[in-house]
Swiss-Prot record:
Residues 283-309 are annotated as: Disordered. SMART domains: PCRF (SM00937). The gene is prfA. Belongs to the prokaryotic/mitochondrial release factor family. This is Peptide chain release factor 1. Its main location: cytoplasm. GO terms for molecular function: translation release factor activity, codon specific. Keywords: Cytoplasm, Methylation, Protein biosynthesis. Pfam families: PCRF, RF-1. Methylated by PrmC. Methylation increases the termination efficiency of RF1. Peptide chain release factor 1 directs the termination of translation in response to the peptide chain termination codons UAG and UAA. It is found in: Cytoplasm. The keyword Transcription regulation does not apply. HAMAP family: Rel_fac_1.
C-alpha cells in the first residue's frame, strides 16, 4: 500500500471548506460558476477523505477501548469484534482515495471522434467494421450519448471501408479511449461454402475532440484545396467545388471531407484535424512522461492488436490485460462495461505503481 499524502489531503479539505464559504457569500455569477465547477471536481475526493478520517477515528476509539484495562469485558469483546471490520473498511477507503488523487487526464471529460477502418480481410473486414460501429453505437445509446455521422465509405458487400463519427456526452473519452488499436475477428463468412474460419481486422481510433483553446492551428500552417465531390462510378454529384482537403503542412496530416456542403466540409475537416493534432500532442507527452506505461494497457499504438472476437467459440479476448469473456453476443450488442471497466482499473493500477516507484 502506497502511503497517502496527508498534506495533500489536508490541503484539499481546506480548499473545499474555503469554496463552501465563498459560495455562501453570494459572489457574482462568473465567480460562482468557477467556484461551483471546482466544488464539483473536489466533492468526490473530499467525501472519501472525510469518510476515511471518520473510520480511522472509529478504529482508534475501538483500539483504545480494547486496550483499556478499565473497560468491562462485554465492551472489550465488542471492540475486539468490530475493529477488524473497521480496518477492512479503512483499507477500501484508502484505495478509493488513492485512485481519486491520481493525476487526471485532461481529455477524459471531452467528447470523442470515433474512426473505424476496415483492415486486412477484404469484404469481411468491411462487414466487421460495420459490426464494430453498431457495437459502439449501441453502447453509446445505453450510456445516453449522442452519435453523429461525419463521413462514411460503405463496403462493396455491406459494412464500411471507413466510418467517422462524433460521440458526445458525459465521460465519453474516459470510457472509449482504450478502444484504439487493431480489432481482429475470427468467424466463418456467410459466403464461405466450406465452413472455414477466416481472420480479418479493423482499426479503431478514438480521438478527444479538441477546442480552439486546446490546440492552436495557424492559418499559415494549413493548405486548403477544394475539388468536385464524386459519387458512384466517379461521376460528379454536383457542379460546384464542394469537397475540401485540408493539409497541415508541419505534420503532413491531411483530412478530406466530400459531402455536398463546402462550408460544412471545411468545418468538419478542421474539427478532425484539430482532434488529430491534439491527440498527437497527448501521445507525445504520454510517451515522454513514462515509458513504463508501454507494458501496461498497451502502448496506445494504433497498429497494436488489442482484441480478438472469436465467433465460433463465442468469446472476446483483450490481449492487453489477458481478459477473456464468453459473452461475445452481448458484447457485440454493446455490453462493453466489463471490458471498459477492467481496462480503466488496470490503467489506475499502473498509475498507482508509478507513484509507488517515485522517490
Amino acid at each position: 500500500m502506497i502511503a497517502l499524502p496527508q498534506d495533500r489531503m489536508d490541503q484539499l479539505l481546506k480548499r473545499f471548506s474555503m469554496i463552501e464559504s465563498q459560495m455562501a457569500n453570494n459572489p457574482d455569477s462568473d465567480t460562482y460558476v468557477k467556484l461551483a465547477s471546482e466544488y464539483s471536481e473536489l466533492q468526490d475526493v473530499v467525501g472519501k477523505i472525510r469518510e476515511l478520517s471518520d473510520a480511522r477515528m472509529e478504529a482508534s476509539d475501538l483500539a483504545a477501548m480494547r486496550d483499556d484495562a478499565s473497560t468491562d469485558a462485554e465492551m472489550r469483546a465488542l471492540a475486539v469484534e468490530e475493529l477488524p471490520e473497521v480496518e477492512k473498511r479503512i483499507a477500501v477507503l484508502e484505495q478509493d482515495v488513492q485512485i481519486l488523487l491520481l493525476p487526471k487526464d485532461a481529455a477524459d471529460d471531452k467528447n470523442a471522434i470515433l474512426e473505424i477502418r476496415a483492415g486486412t480481410g477484404g469484404l469481411e473486414a468491411a462487414l466487421f467494421a460495420g459490426d464494430l460501429f453498431r457495437m459502439y453505437e449501441r453502447y453509446a445509446a445505453e450510456k445516453g450519448w449522442r452519435v453523429e455521422l461525419v463521413s462514411a465509405s460503405e463496403g462493396d458487400a455491406g459494412g464500411y471501408k471507413e466510418i467517422i463519427t462524433t460521440v458526445s456526452g458525459k465521460g465519453v473519452f474516459s470510457k472509449l479511449k482504450f478502444e484504439s488499436g487493431v480489432h481482429r475477428v475470427q468467424r466463418v463468412p456467410e459466403t464461405e461454402a466450406g465452413g472455414r474460419i477466416h481472420t480479418s481486422a479493423a482499426t479503431v481510433a478514438v480521438l478527444p475532440e479538441a477546442e480552439d483553446i486546446d490546440i492552436e492551428i495557424r492559418n499559415e500552417d494549413i493548405r486548403i484545396d477544394t475539388m468536385r465531390a464524386s459519387g458512384a462510378g466517379g461521376q460528379h454529384v454536383n457542379t460546384t467545388d464542394s469537397a475540401v482537403r485540408i493539409t497541415h503542412i508541419p505534420t503532413g496530416i491531411m483530412v478530406v471531407q466530400a459531402e455536398k456542403s463546402q462550408h460544412q466540409n471545411r468545418a468538419r475537416a478542421m474539427q478532425i484535424l484539430r482532434a488529430r493534432l491534439y491527440d498527437m500532442e497527448r501521445q507525445k507527452a504520454e510517451s515522454e512522461r513514462s515509458q513504463a506505461r508501454r507494458s501496461q494497457v498497451g502502448s496506445g499504438d494504433r497498429s497494436e492488436r488489442i482484441r480478438t472476437y472469436n465467433f465460433p467459440q463465442g468469446r472476446v479476448t483483450d490481449h492487453r490485460i489477458n481478459l477473456t469473456l464468453y459473452k461475445l453476443d452481448r458484447v457485440m450488442e454493446g455490453d462493453l462495461d466489463e471490458l471498459v471497466d477492467a481496462l480503466i482499473s488496470d490503467h489506475q493500477t499502473a498509475l498507482l505503481a508509478e507513484l509507488g516507484e517515485q522517490p
